């Protein structure tokens, strides 16, 4: 007996006599459920107020931020109005060139006003964050709350210590000129696979077009979209045969596995996917190397270098460049403390930050030789006094007095 559905189609008509239609549907990629009404979520005055206060954290020294906070409710109303009637027009960014000490490169920042552009960017991310995080790879890190370099450091250190056979080989890759090379049209189409709110997508399109070619370094929204754009690449590489451990810190990709040939295949697949699907390219300085050397073989093993550390089988050390910078800072502070010259807040904070990295690697001898002779309590006292001074100045800015402490 042939069972008939309410539509009038039988089981044979629906699936085919040999089940070919069912197989076809199973193999076809299913469109993910898309989210709508995100623009309407932005039209919430409580959310706008929260975003303004969050965006102003650690920026009270800026005149434009103090102006917005002094008339908070007025700016909440104005933000709501320009979004509700669609009168918001993205501001053309100002260009600023800085020298990035960590990467030893000159970078071009694009800066927009705190209001309205900075607030609108943050509002977009706030309502879009659950959508972007939904399919993100667990070890896709950088510029995401709770996903910094420490997450990758723990993962790689554990892998190198506990699985020497599965980490015999490593592959390191870097995307060439990542931010300025992202094609905006492809990015918007990729976002459209998860978001169906056309008004919301038009707003993102207008912001991205205003920043010129590619994504802008300095836009809060761009760092989220950059991670989202590489989501497909992350899952493709993480699932490839021979790739046992996979991490990505913004545009720096690290893969570990037991077989060198399989890692080369993953590298070639990544280059093809980036070129054909994402419109990007891999730098020529990619590396595939062995992290362990057999006892009878000549040569030394190489360490995996990522997020400021070098990961060996069984222990972790600081990168040479980071170690030398910490050493120079330590000698300057030692000299000042011996001569009785006060250490500046910037020097104290910078040294304590770099010295804190030693707590996350094997550094007993380094601490004994370079850190023990420095009076750490004095440096913490300098930072504490500056923090109290800034706190009192912040209360005085609004004509109030700080609460009494016990």
Describe the residue ranges of each PLM region:
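Non-catalytic, polymerase-adjacent accessory regions of viral genome-replication enzymes
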Residues: 1-77, 81, 398, 402-406
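Right-hand nucleic-acid polymerase module
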Residues: 3-5, 11-14, 19-22, 118, ...
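Active-site-proximal segment of RNA-dependent polymerases
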Residues: 25-38, 125-183
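Reverse-transcriptase-like RNA-dependent polymerase core
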Residues: 82-105, 119, 196-210
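Conserved pre-motif C helix in the palm subdomain of viral-like polymerases
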Residues: 106-137, 212-239
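Beta-rich nucleic-acid/ligand-interaction surfaces
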Residues: 142-152, 254-256, 287-297
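Conserved polymerase palm-domain catalytic core
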Residues: 154-250, 254-269, 289-290, 303
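A common structural junction motif
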Residues: 195, 271-280
